Amino acid sequence: MKRCRSDELQQQQGEEDGAGLEDAASHLPGADLRPGETTGANSAGGPTSDAGAAAAPNPGPRSKPPDLKKIQQLSEGSMFGHGLKHLFHSRRRSREREHQTSQDSQQHQQQQGMSDHDSPDEKERSPEMHRVSYAMSLHDLPARPTAFNRVLQQIRSRPSIKRGASLHSSSGGGSSGSSSRRTKSSSLEPQRGSPHLLRKAPQDSSLAAILHQHQCRPRSSSTTDTALLLADGSNVYLLAEEAEGIGDKVDKGDLVALSLPAGHGDTDGPISLDVPDGAPDPQRTKAAIDHLHQKILKITEQIKIEQEARDDNVAEYLKLANNADKQQVSRIKQVFEKKNQKSAQTIAQLHKKLEHYRRRLKEIEQNGPSRQPKDVLRDMQQGLKDVGANVRAGISGFGGGVVEGVKGSLSGLSQATHTAVVSKPREFASLIRNKFGSADNIAHLKDPLEDGPPEEAARALSGSATLVSSPKYGSDDECSSASASSAGAGSNSGAGPGGALGSPKSNALYGAPGNLDALLEELREIKEGQSHLEDSMEDLKTQLQRDYTYMTQCLQEERYRYERLEEQLNDLTELHQNEMTNLKQELASMEEKVAYQSYERARDIQEAVESCLTRVTKLELQQQQQQVVQLEGVENANARALLGKFINVILALMAVLLVFVSTIANFITPLMKTRLRITSTTLLVLVLFLLWKHWDSLTYLLEHVLLPS
């Protein structure tokens, strides 16, 4: 396992950052505590603090400690502790002002009929409704893991902690020290095998560490792990983070391991949480639910539209397929399959979105709206300057070598802190403030190694080493480095009033006889936390084994599917080869058939040609015979001439006869033109007929009548 990155900070950066440290010291802020907290601090340990301020002069130069790394850890813990104080104090005051104006803004919105997420006040105090760089709207937030929801539910269900049982409560003489309530450490999962991997001691077994697999960007040369060991007495607050990895995790809502401290703060009353997790804003929840309902309705309408479009495509395909030929049907089918596949993919995506929105709606109805970064920490640069000033003031009692070591570690620490914290959402800051009560409490952490007896300091240091000792370290050097970090976290200089080194309050705390029992109790809690971590590791191993089994099963199924596909491919190949063989055989048989048919056709054509030649020969013979007959008919030409002349004579006679007939007809025709002529002609003919018939009688009569005389 790798060592902490803070142990690897070298002294060669000291000269580089010396000027920056001196500039940061010039911005040392004054007393920035609220009146309630100042009163509580004075009421809890007023006599002790006054006595310590009077009895503790400004310490002179001390001898150089034997281990420079331990002193560097002390200075780093003091620096970042006071920086967190000034960082979260201003944020807490702004949250209080926002909380005071929330009721008036809500009433004003109800009177005007404005929606809950459209009002500027609600946009200012509800980070979920902002459009920030992490998610464009509330409904584009990534769904939090169910394990993290369980942790938040358990945190919300815990009772409020009174400040009366603070760690700083002590007697006036310092001999009768009371055992304080121990706080749990809240930590984020360090990246890439940090030595502070989930080293925390929760009291509640249900708040065990939740290991979450998360892929983050690889470390660059400029990003360093920042290990913050904030210790009050024998309590260890471990905040191990990686600048880019943790920023990505917090942006995505992947807060890995959170635990609520049992009690921390001054003796002036209960810890004041700005916005309790258990009581979300009902109007904001209602607005989120309404917005999700609108999105669900919109997605449902889109699904209906896509389904109707797909049905129309099917109907159009059937209509076109009935009126097309085979080639057009194949083309139409390809186009339809593409359209159908695209619409199916669109419908599947819409269904996924619908299920996602329904899960988020159910989650919001159960746990309230999920948090989102409201504002970037605007005063982070000033806080970092205050950190440098506080480090300079806190380590003023040490030798020049200590200052050089702190200067060397300040550059990398401030760079990593600025990179990590500025990119974090506001939820991370509020969670840290809820865990530690108020960030101002860090200023009350004193250094037991400054003014106490050497044996008490050694005992406190050994107790801290006992607290952080764990089999997770690979060597004694790493363990000693972590021990120095744990002990140094309690040596916060405190830049506020009364924040001088070597406070008698801390000496009384660490010199009390009851601290041994408290240390044993803390060690017991750490062992319990380690057991919880081991259980979580076992659960993770079980999950990994389950995933491995599932992947193995999937691989076996894919292998079986691959074998089946290979068998099908082999069968298809054999079938293809058989079909090719059959085609070759059919081609050979067809060739034989074509050759036979062509031979038969040629033979038929030959026979037809021979028959034609025979007919031509017969015609030639007939023509020759006719020519012979014609030659024989020339001899009878005279007889034929006589016959012709006789026929001509007969024709001439017939012509003469016809002339006579025509002449007679010409005489008769005028007599037959009218009815009168026809009648007279008929009578004349009858008379002539009668005369011809009685001609003998008429002649006899004429002879006897006319010729009697």
Curated annotation (Swiss-Prot):
Residues 333-368, 514-633 form a coiled coil. Keywords: Coiled coil, Endoplasmic reticulum, Membrane, Methylation, Phosphoprotein, Transmembrane, Transmembrane helix. It is found in: Endoplasmic reticulum membrane. Residues 115-131 have a biased composition (Basic and acidic residues). The chain crosses the membrane at residues 649-669, 682-702. The keyword Membrane applies. GO terms for biological process: amyloid precursor protein metabolic process. Residues 1-143, 158-202, 444-500 are annotated as: Disordered. Its main location: endoplasmic reticulum. Residues 83-94 have a biased composition (Basic residues). Residues 44-57, 102-114, 480-490 have a biased composition (Low complexity). It comes from the Eukaryota. One of its GO terms (cellular component) is endoplasmic reticulum membrane. The modification Phosphoserine is found at S6, S438, S464, S470, S503. The modification Omega-N-methylarginine is found at R163. Residues 491-500 have a biased composition (Gly residues). May form homodimers and heterodimers with TMCC2 or TMCC3 via the coiled-coil domains. Interacts with ribosomal proteins RPL4 and RPS6. Interacts with APOE and proteolytic processed C-terminal fragment C99 of the amyloid precursor protein (APP C99). Belongs to the TEX28 family. May be involved in the regulation of the proteolytic processing of the amyloid precursor protein (APP) possibly also implicating APOE. This is Transmembrane and coiled-coil domains protein 2. It comes from Homo sapiens (Human).
